[in-house]
Amino acid sequence: MDSPDRFYRKKVAQPVNVTGVFVATQEAVRHMKQGGRIIHIGSSMTRYAAFPTAAVYTLTKGAITGFNRSLVRDLGPKGITVNTVHPGPTDTDMNPADGPVAAIVGPGMAIGRYGRPDEIASVVAYLASPESGFVTGADIVADGGFTA
């Protein structure tokens, strides 16, 4: 596991994907007096499909799922729902639909294309809405059938 992604492991994976999620959640909960919504972003890759060299990423994103399972029980009595959205390959600057990873994941896309950021945002918007008041502890996979 000592690979060229050493910088990623040391400066991004743990500080952003784990510590960042924990600290941001802790601070948000301090301000939620009358209930609220916590929505974390995981990754469908860590839920159902693993790739070579993705062990650290998988570890850090998978930590969110375990964290949320405990939060559901801790925060439910306070009227706070906790859910995770697990996007699949999404066309972003970091992972463009015409980038090098697309050749690997493209054939596995059931709908034949990468997701759009607005499609992931619509799932998050639903979870933030009053209509999702009974949804908590959910892992919602929005990956175009990538992990189907």
Q: Residue locations for each model-derived region?
A:
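Short, small/polar-rich loop/turn modules that mediate ligand/substrate recognition or access, typified
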Residues: 76, 81, 135-137
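Short C-terminal tail/terminal secondary-structure segment
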Residues: 48, 125, 136-148
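Short, flexible catalytic-loop segment of classical short-chain dehydrogenase/reductase
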Residues: 47, 82, 86-97
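A conserved structural motif in NAD(P)-dependent oxidoreductases
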Residues: 109-120, 131
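Active-site helix of classical SDR
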Residues: 25, 60, 68
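Alpha-helical segment proximal to the catalytic Tyr-Lys
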Residues: 30-31, 73-74, 133
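Active-site loop-to-helix junction immediately N-terminal to the catalytic Tyr of the SDR YXXXK motif
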Residues: 49-58, 70
